[in-house]
Amino acid sequence: MKKIVYTLLMVLMFSGCANVETYNLKYADSGKTLKLALGDTVNVELPENPTTGYSWAFFTNPEPQNIITNITESYRQYNVAENMVGVGGIKIFSFKATHPGKVTVTGYYYRPWENMTESYVSKVVYNIVVKKPLTHQGE
C-alpha cells in the first residue's frame, strides 16, 4: 500500500513540473515549422498600419481550429513623436496549443472590404506541430 501511495505522489509531483513554453514568430519566420507541446503559446508579431485600411487576418488548415486556439490579439504602436498620425506598429496574435496534430496557419495582410485572395499585399505561413503528451508504457 505504501508503494502505491508513494508512486501516486511521485506522479502528481512530476506531472505539475511540465514546462509551458512561449515562442515568438516574426514576419521573417514565414515558412518555418514550429513544434509545440500542449499548453505552449506562440506569439506572432507582424508589422501593421491600421491607418492604411490594411490588417492581418489568420486562417488555419485544416479547419476547425482545435489544434491551436487564438487567445489574444493586441497592437503596439511604434515609438514616435507625440501627435504623429499614420504611424504603424506591431500586431501581436497569441495562439495556444490545445490538441495534438498538425496545422498550417496562414496570415493575409489585406483590406477586409476587398477580396482577400486578389487584394492581399503580404502573406505569412507557419506550420505548427503540437506533440502528443508522453504516456507510460502499456497505456
Spans of model-derived segments:
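Sec-dependent signal peptide recognition
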Residues: K2-T7
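Glycine-centered tight-turn and secondary-structure capping sites
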Residues: F95-V105
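Aromatic sugar-binding surface patches on proteins
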Residues: V85-I92
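Extracytoplasmic/periplasmic copper-protein system
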Residues: E21-A28, E114-E139
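C-terminal motif of bacterial Sec signal peptides marking the signal peptidase cleavage site
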Residues: S15-G16
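N-terminal edge beta-strand
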Residues: N19-N43, N49
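Short, solvent-exposed loop/linker segments at beta-strand-coil boundaries, enriched for Pro/Gly
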Residues: T52, T60-N79
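Beta-strand-rich extracellular modules
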Residues: Y108-P112
